Amino acid sequence: RPGGMLMNGIPSFRLEKDVVDAEIDILRELGVEFRCGVEVGKDVTIAQLREQGYQSFYVAVGLQSGGKLNIPGGDADGVMAGIDFMRQVNLHEKKTLSGKVVVIGGGNIGADVARTAVRCGAESVDLYCLEAYDDMPMGEEDRSECERDGITVHAGWGQTEIVVEDGKCAGIRFRKCTRVKNDEGRFAPEFDDSVSEQAECATVLYCIGQKVDWRELLTGTAVEFNPNGTVKADPVTYQTAEKDIFVGGDAYTGQKFAIDAIAAGKEGAISLHRFVQHATLTVGRNRRQFIELDKENALIPVNYDTTPRQRIGYNEALRRTFSDERVAFTEEQIKK
């Protein structure tokens, strides 16, 4: 089915699928044809598509691979990439979990996976991450919703080994993480091996970074790649070294939000249109260059409205279900 990560990677309690289906139906009405189950590079090549009359291509395959958990026992039964778990749940291939579950990763995806595991019937869900609690990549709302769902967060731990019994996951060991980044701000975690912890569990779902699985998609093209597997392209037009191939979304930027990929798609559409019309790709384009506000030195008037940010409510009847439990602001909140 069409929809990509919006359909297969994001839980329905975060983004209900009928919303995406409605948007896809609009595209169909506009004349867009969807061909699902086709692997470009294997079933058909870009060269063959050119022969069929296609003049330009936009590649937005995202970061579909969760990689491997490179620790002893990482290939045991019960150990799975979080993105693969989400795909199985959204495609209705997996709806139930039993026993205790450990989720590795303190980002937004880790939160989604942990909350989904709760809804799949896990006995308990514990989330471990390298960062200190206040430094976790996931936002404040995600942390609050994890706690609301009964998920226990263990901040400042790095996985070392899966405990395996009869080929199956029986637990996982951690060591204390004392530092995540070095003085230059680069990812270089440091650990205290004298402080360890072991968690009993039947399932480990790891969310520690995703990557692009290109397979044979761009074989035979002049497209160039970055060391992390993303594609090199013009930052304004998204044109690659292969002039009729454009790229966008996470396959170009690395892991970002869905809304960033959607915005890139709109700019990519402009480039595709100009390319097939033999027009300039650069004149009049939004270069997306912004100057960050220096909040520390901003002059705030004495009468500035200091009303705090309003928080959403929840429908208790939908708690721990796959329906979106969030509710709109009340009239009183809007008046504030």
Language model regions located:
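Residue-level detector of alpha-helix initiation sites
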Residues: R1, G107-I109, A251-Y252
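Rossmann-like dinucleotide-binding cores of NAD(P)H-dependent redox enzymes
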Residues: P2-E29, F34, V89, A114-E161, ...
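Ferredoxin-like iron-sulfur electron-transfer modules
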Residues: M7-N8, V38-V40, V44, L97-S98, ...
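Feature captures the FAD/FMN-dependent oxidoreductase FAD-binding
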Residues: D21-I71, E161-R173, T178-K181, C201-L205, ...
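Glycine-rich dinucleotide-binding loop and its adjacent helix/turn
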Residues: D25-E39, G66-C120, F225-A241
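FAD-site-proximal beta/loop scaffold in flavoenzymes
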Residues: D77-S98, I162, N182-Q255, I300
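Mid-to-C-terminal Rossmann-like scaffold of FAD/NAD(P)H-dependent oxidoreductases
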Residues: R148-G150, G158-K168, V180, R274-K336
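A conserved FAD-binding loop/helix module that cradles the flavin
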Residues: G248-A279
